[in-house]
Amino acid sequence: MRALAYFKKGDIHFTNDIPRPEIQTDDEVIIDVSWCGICGSDLHEYLDGPIFMPKDGECHKLSNAALPLAMGHEMSGIVSKVGPKVTKVKVGDHVVVDAASSCADLHCWPHSKFYNSKPCDACQRGSENLCTHAGFVGLGVISGGFAEQVVVSQHHIIPVPKEIPLDVAALVEPLSVTWHAVKISGFKKGSSALVLGAGPIGLCTILVLKGMGASKIVVSEIAERRIEMAKKLGVEVFNPSKHGHKSIEILRGLTKSHDGFDYSYDCSGIQVTFETSLKALTFKGTATNIAVWGPKPVPFQPMDVTLQEKVMTGSIGYVVEDFEEVVRAIHNGDIAMEDCKQLITGKQRIEDGWEKGFQELMDHKESNVKILLTPNNHGEMK
């Protein structure tokens, strides 16, 4: 089938030769992909990989899949075929996919050394995002959403009301990342929040905070194009490059108490945002790291936390419930459909996905949020 695939380190290109998926276990579903967003993880896989993808000549530890594999994990689509034990969806349903693989999926891969092994402790406790065997559809486990079709277990399928357009539905995955993070932080309705960075994850964090009833949201960002994007979402923007060493003091003063924010979310992952995420908090405030950091350590003063009983935590990925809650939030208007559409800065066919998708994002990072690719199964590019 047609796909934009990862062949080896530094080689992503369109092909007609990715095998079409087949149902192999009774609980699997085949989806005709409508839209799939390009994620920062996809870019990192090209620039720095293989990270999640198997190395050239090797197989993935979970599924035994080998390259080439279609990329893409932020997908929406229409159910094309269901296994005999599938009860969650039917042919023709609109759906999104929780692309994370865990112990719950080991039954799908009889050639894996982990086949039908006992679930890890994290999975037994319901934290599948922390699974010992964690992996992602479209990032090495099996081929993903930059293809005509994808196959996944019904456990990972989330039905989407047809009132939600399928291009907007493709944003449910990145929104679920930030929904999970805001839940992890213990966010309470009516609280104030600081978002550090207005890239794709920062902007998704804004939408989630608005949906959860934040009383005040301030976004700290220095790039003018991203500042404009954040303003379009109706939040206050602070540019720390204009205030130097007084930035934290000024930020704290922007809250109703003039004493700092109840919650902060680091979506940038650099030393200055790490420090700000803690120091801009009020007493008993919570700082949550969503950013993916490199291996370099950063200085940390424990008394920044201890003296005012602040909390520092982190969040990774999502679970199925996050997807279900995001879909409900969009459907009932807590997350505005028009706000979601603001995040879509490009749409391309998978045939053009490398030049007009990946290269566009790498060359013009600050002027793009989310570029969606489609195999055009149902005339999506009309």
Swiss-Prot record:
Keywords: Cytoplasm, Metal-binding, NAD, Oxidoreductase, Phosphoprotein, Zinc. Zn(2+) 1 binds at residues 39, 73, 173. The modification Phosphoserine is found at residue 63. It is found in: Cytoplasm. NAD-dependent (R,R)-butanediol dehydrogenase which catalyzes oxidation of (R,R)-butane-2,3-diol to (3R)-acetoin, of meso-butanediol to (3S)-acetoin, and reduction of acetoin. Allows the use of 2,3-butanediol as an aerobic carbon source. Present with 8730 molecules/cell in log phase SD medium. This is (R,R)-butanediol dehydrogenase. It comes from Saccharomyces cerevisiae (strain ATCC 204508 / S288c) (Baker's yeast).
